[in-house]
Amino acid sequence: MGKLIDKTIDNSYANELKKQCPSSDMASVTVNIDPETSMVFDNQYYKNLVVHKGLFQSDSVLLNDDSTRKFVEDFANDQELFFESWDQSFMKLTSVGVKTGDEGEIRRICGATNA
């Protein structure tokens, strides 16, 4: 049985992903999150989402709700707005701090708690 393809993805993009990913479940296969400008920090990923070429289903569903669709469309249409928002978010994230000891742990393997 073949793998199911998200019907909301652009057909040409889905076909390209099928070419890049073998039918076996090989964990070593990687694809670019943004095939257009993969080595550049820009708003292209949002542009891709708007035309249904998002790699992650969790991002693609942002278009399903009016409140989140507006953010995707605004970031796709205004790179400076995206940069400003990213800058503010990144600065907030740097002030969170690392929880250690009884409050948390830094995992050696992301998908598993330290034993």
Task: Please identify what each model-predicted range represents.
Residues M1-A115:
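Catalytic cores of secreted/periplasmic or lumenal enzymes
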